[in-house]
């Protein structure tokens, strides 16, 4: 593994992994196991992200949360917790109210010459949104 490679674990949270959640993602347990096996290969170079609801949705998020009002809870709500496998206080956590997680905070953690290895359960949404923003 490259010395500047970081594993960015995107949105492995209760809201996406708990069977009773309206946003439960099929295959979550299998993906969780694979990521848990992969993470130690990166040592300290692992960062987690969380999707959280905005306090006051704006723009396209207004009708989105009208469809999903259960998710309009504070960032401290257990729904937005990382699942137990990924509650690792030694690794940084970036929380964002958007699908994509690339921002100045994440860029600052990784540094200018880092290689990102992206993983998560919603590759068609949050993972790809992060990858595309980082590529820009």
What spans do the regions from the language model cover?
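Short glycine-/acidic-enriched loop or helix-start segments at secondary-structure transitions
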Residues: 18-19, 57-59, 103-105, 127-130
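Ser/Thr-centric signal marking residues that sit
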Residues: 49, 123, 130
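Active-site acidic carboxylates
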Residues: 1-93
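Generic recognition of cysteine residues
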Residues: 24, 125-126
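Internal catalytic-core helix/loop-beta-alpha segment
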Residues: 76-125
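Histidine-anchored nucleotide/phosphate-binding helix
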Residues: 34-41, 128-136
């Amino acid at each position: 593994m490259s010395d500047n490679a970081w594993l960015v674990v995107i949105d492995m949270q209760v809201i996406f992994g708990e069977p009773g959640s309206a946003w439960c993602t099929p295959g979550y347990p299998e993906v969780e196991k694979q990521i848990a096996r992969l993470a130690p290969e990166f040592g300290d170079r692992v960062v987690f992200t969380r999707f959280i609801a905005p306090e006051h949705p704006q723009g396209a998020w207004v009708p989105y949360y009208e469809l999903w009002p259960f998710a309009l809870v504070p960032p401290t709500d257990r729904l937005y917790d990382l699942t137990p496998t990924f509650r690792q206080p030694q690794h940084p956590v970036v929380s964002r109210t958007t699908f994509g997680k690339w921002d100045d905070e994440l860029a600052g953690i990784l540094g200018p010459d880092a290689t990102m290895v992206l993983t998560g359960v919603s590759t068609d949404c949050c993972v790809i949104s992060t990858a595309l923003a980082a590529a820009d």
